[in-house]
């Protein structure tokens, strides 16, 4: 009579917040690769080490400026958008106004009521 032993190993996906945080850091440190017509398909980074480059993000086209209106990519820009001055999220004035400044608009809503005095 023999005995049988099982061992099970598995990988668990990390929390989405952790993954997104790592990706954001990599995005902010991404390296621009200047491509040209003489490109042979071989990339020789001068300042980057091969091991580091394998774990980092690289890009060869600059992102469009989403602050300004661009009809080619159907981007309306952010001018005239309402921002939240107390927010630290995507709707914050720092993100939406793109350094152009913003105006503070105070509004007092008026509603009809059937009040009698």
Curated annotation (Swiss-Prot):
GO MF annotation terms: cytokine activity; frizzled binding
Where mainly located?
secreted
Highest taxon above the source species = Eukaryota
Q: Where is the lipid attached (O-palmitoleoyl serine)?
A: 1
Q: Where in the cell is it found?
A: Secreted, Extracellular space, Extracellular matrix; Secreted
Biological processes annotated in GO: canonical Wnt signaling pathway; cell fate commitment; neuron differentiation
- UniProt-listed SMART domains: WNT1
- Keyword annotations of the record: Developmental protein, Disulfide bond, Extracellular matrix, Glycoprotein, Lipoprotein, Secreted, Wnt signaling pathway
UniProt entry tagged with the keyword Plastid? no
The entry's cellular-component GO terms read: extracellular space
Q: Establish whether keyword Lipoprotein is in the entry.
A: yes
Cysteine pairs bridged by disulfides in the record: 83-98
- How this protein is processed and modified after translation, per its record? Palmitoleoylation is required for efficient binding to frizzled receptors. Depalmitoleoylation leads to Wnt signaling pathway inhibition.
Any coiled-coil ranges, and where?
A: none
Residues bearing attached sugar chains per UniProt: 84
Provide the function of this protein: Member of the Wnt ligand gene family that encodes for secreted proteins, which activate the Wnt signaling cascade. Involved in neurogenesis. Performs a partially redundant function with wnt1 in the formation of the midbrain-hindbrain boundary (MHB) organizer.
| Protein family per UniProt | Belongs to the Wnt family.
What is the designated name of this protein?
A: Protein Wnt-10b
Lineage of origin: Eukaryota, Metazoa, Chordata, Craniata, Vertebrata
